[in-house]
């Protein structure tokens, strides 16, 4: 007797290949970039978090001066501190020009969803490695989703969202000390955002399980 088994196809995309978590883990950024054979990363931030990007730049420069002669020094290609909410494509285009002229070989985003979104937009367009250093609880660094805003003639803005495994950052460094200086209001809103992401993921997992197992499998 021949039986027919209907299987529900699905796709699964893994989270970032590498996650580093703990207090003081930001100090591991130079080693992570060296592991990726990066020597000229472009640092991304919002205007409000320029000081944090400058601190990263100092960290990388000091690590290069203390590295052995056999190691390739890491010299940041520069800082692009124009990241803003909803990832406007006009900002992305300006950042792309900086990537090209500076010959950056990676992007490092430090901040929340706005900066990480810009890093995603650059990485998916260029294929460059993207290392995230989150400073909020938004969770954008753990999703392969990119939301962008384009402005058409007449000032009309259009929000576009897409999903692609190439959008997912390759390395995420969670230094819990970076969240300690967040204002209480921002901590609360980004925390709620993280809970919302977790709830959506839980619902998605349950729906995936139901789609896989709702059809009985007949023995051959």
PLM region descriptions:
Residues 29, 51, 117-118, 182:
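Glycine/Thr-rich phosphate-binding loops of Rossmann-like dinucleotide-binding domains
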């Amino acid at each position: 007797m021949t039986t027919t088994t209907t299987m529900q196809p699905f796709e699964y995309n893994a989270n970032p290949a590498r996650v580093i978590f703990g207090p003081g883990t930001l100090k591991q950024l130079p080693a992570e970039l060296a592991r990726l054979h990066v020597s000229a990363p472009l640092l991304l931030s919002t205007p409000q978090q320029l000081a944090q990007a400058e601190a990263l730049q100092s960290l990388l420069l000091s690590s290069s001066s203390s590295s052995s002669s056999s190691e390739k020094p890491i010299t940041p290609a520069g800082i692009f501190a124009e990241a803003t909410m909803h990832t406007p494509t006009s900002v992305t285009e300006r950042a792309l020009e900086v990537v090209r002229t500076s010959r950056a070989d990676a992007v490092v985003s430090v901040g929340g969803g706005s900066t990480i979104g810009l890093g995603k937009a650059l990485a998916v367009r260029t294929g460059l490695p993207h290392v995230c250093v989150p400073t909020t609880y938004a969770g954008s660094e753990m999703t392969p989703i990119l939301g962008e805003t384009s402005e058409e003639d007449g000032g009309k803005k259009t929000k576009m969202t897409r999903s692609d495994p190439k959008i997912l950052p390759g390395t995420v460094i969670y230094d819990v000390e970076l969240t300690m200086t967040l204002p209480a209001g921002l901590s609360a809103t980004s925390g709620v955002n993280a809970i919302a992401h977790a709830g959506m993921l839980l619902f998605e997992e349950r729906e995936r399980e139901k789609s896989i197992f709702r059809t009985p499998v007949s023995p051959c």
